[in-house]
Structures are given as C-alpha cells and as structure tokens.
C-alpha cells in the first residue's frame, strides 16, 4: 500500500503542492503543502501501524487544511477535491456523515476508495505482547455514502495491484486547466491502509497549485 501511495505522489504534476494528513484514532497534518516530492515519499515510508480509525476527523482536517491556503492574487479560491482510501469503518471522532456534510457545504467532492475484502484480517503486534489476529472487513457502504453525499466517485480495490491502478487512474486525471491563468486547485486526500487489508493507520494527501 505504501508503494501505491508513492506511485500516486509521483503521478501528480510537479507544480501542484502536496500535503500529508496521517490519522489513526486522531488526524494530524504530517506534511504541509509542498512541491518537494521526496519529503512526501519519506513521510509515507515512515508510516507505522496504529490503532483505530477516524475517517471523519481526517476529512475535517483536510478541509481545514484547504481553508488555510490563501486565495490567489485576484482573491480567487480555486475548486478542490478529496480522494479518500480506507475500509470505511470509523471508530473514533466525529461521524463520517458530519464530515461529508461539511465537505458538501464547502463544495468539495470526496471520492473514496474501498481497499480490502469483506473477510480481511491482519496480524497486529504491540511491543512486548503476543501478535493478535485482527478482523478488518471493508465497509463499502460508508465509503460509497461519503462519495454520493459529496458528488464524488466511489472506487474499489481488493489488492495492492488494484489499488495502484486506481491511484494511476486518479493521478493521471490531475492537472491544469489552461485559460488566462492556471485555475485548477486539487485537494487530493487518500486514506490508505499502511498494511494491506487494515485501516488502523491511514493517510490523506492534499494539494493546490502555487
């Protein structure tokens, strides 16, 4: 899953700033918007498995990050988009529905990727404790509902290969609209499981044009 995220970062046009929001039971901005792709890659590679999932908080954190970016010289705030990858099961923080409603109110579509299978399992290890088998089934309905509520698009991926293809499809569609000036603003958020078939630790990307 890390490799798929890194591939996605590489696909985004260099002039577009990317940021990273990491979330498990809470959400936090790991990398502020930057065109430094190596900084993003290094941050993704350092991700470690955590407990719980707060998808709603990740969306709220992403929306706040978008709101903190100043408008251009003409005072225009370009449109934004969110792409979220996870298993859809929120265990901590504010409900997904509240986050989706806030995104809809702000006019920011949230596309979602369901990553995993209905019978997914992982082995979770805490230092000094015996490994535990953890059930992490995918809840596609929650992720589909987020996309539907915000005019986003819903995707599914049951393997690392399928996930990479989804990111390829999304990344290849991110670019510039040429008019009198560059006006496209992409906020790309992806909640991606650190290990395949788990959503214990997730991340989100956000971006905007310089």
Report the location of each language-model feature.
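Non-transmembrane functional regions of envelope-associated proteins
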Residues: 20-21, 28-48, 60, 67, ...
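…and closely analogous acidic/polar surface helices at protein-protein or active-site interfaces
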Residues: 1-18, 32-37
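C-terminal signal-anchor/stop-transfer transmembrane helix together with its immediate cytosolic
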Residues: 172-210
């Amino acid at each position: 899953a890390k490799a798929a995220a890194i591939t996605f970062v590489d696909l985004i046009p260099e002039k577009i700033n990317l940021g990273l929001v990491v979330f498990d039971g809470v959400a936090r901005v790991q990398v502020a918007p930057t065109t430094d792709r190596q900084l993003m890659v290094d941050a993704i590679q350092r991700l470690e498995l955590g407990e719980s999932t707060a998808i709603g908080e990740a969306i709220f954190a992403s929306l706040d990050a978008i709101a903190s970016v100043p408008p251009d010289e003409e005072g225009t705030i370009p449109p934004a988009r969110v792409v979220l990858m996870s298993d859809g099961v929120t265990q901590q923080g504010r409900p997904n529905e509240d986050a989706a409603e806030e995104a809809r109110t702000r006019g920011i579509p949230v596309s979602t990727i369901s990553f995993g299978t209905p019978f997914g399992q992982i082995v979770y290890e805490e230092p000094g404790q015996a490994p535990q088998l953890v059930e992490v089934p995918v809840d596609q309905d929650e992720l589909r509902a987020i996309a539907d509520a915000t005019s986003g698009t819903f995707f599914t991926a049951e393997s690392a290969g399928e996930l990479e293809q989804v990111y390829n499809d999304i990344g290849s569609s991110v670019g510039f609209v040429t008019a009198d000036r560059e006006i496209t603003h992409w906020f790309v958020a992806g909640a991606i499981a650190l290990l395949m078939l788990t959503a214990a630790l997730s991340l989100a990307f956000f971006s905007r044009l310089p």
